Amino acid sequence: GVSFLYVKKELQENVHPLVISWGWESEKPGSSKFLDWHEWQGTRDMSAFLTVPAAVKFLKEHNWPEVSRKCRESVVTFRKKFIDHLNIESPCPDNWLGQMASIPLPVLDAVTFKKNLMETYHIQVPVFEWENKTYLRYSIQAYNSEDELTKLLSAVKELLS
């Protein structure tokens, strides 16, 4: 995988790397301290960096803001279905959501619930415990279908019945 980070010049001095490498206190610094700090972390195959322009072009050509909006809409719609089925209050307002949501589940054992989702329904999603509660987190990307969300909802309903 690859990612890129854009930071305005005037803010670059305030952004520090989470992991430091050879550029941190380089004996031969480059023209940009920001690049020295962030660009190179150890031995790396540089071919991933070369894919970034094509990825940005792909996002532009496929109207990614609209794709993202539709994904978020699906997250909100299905979260409402989860909340209605579980008869729980919404953990947060809809406008806090992006393309991901966490649903509190009335189960005590997150590991077993996750294992049952995978082994019985072939569904892989994060199920985790936080502050003595169990949560299921799902995210929607362009390649996800409504059928997959319906399958997840049905599986959760069956496991909780």
Q: What residue spans do the PLM features occupy?
A:
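Conserved PLP-dependent catalytic core of the aminotransferase class-I/II
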Residues: 49, 53-90
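PLP-dependent enzyme catalytic core of the Aspartate aminotransferase-like
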Residues: 115-161
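PLP-dependent aminotransferase class I/II
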Residues: 17-60
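Active-site PLP attachment segment
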Residues: 1-25
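Conserved PLP-binding catalytic core of the aspartate aminotransferase-like
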Residues: 72-76, 85-120
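A general structural signal for well-ordered alpha-helical segments in protein cores
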Residues: 49-52, 79, 110, 114, ...
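Short beta-strand-to-loop capping motifs
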Residues: 7, 103-107, 140
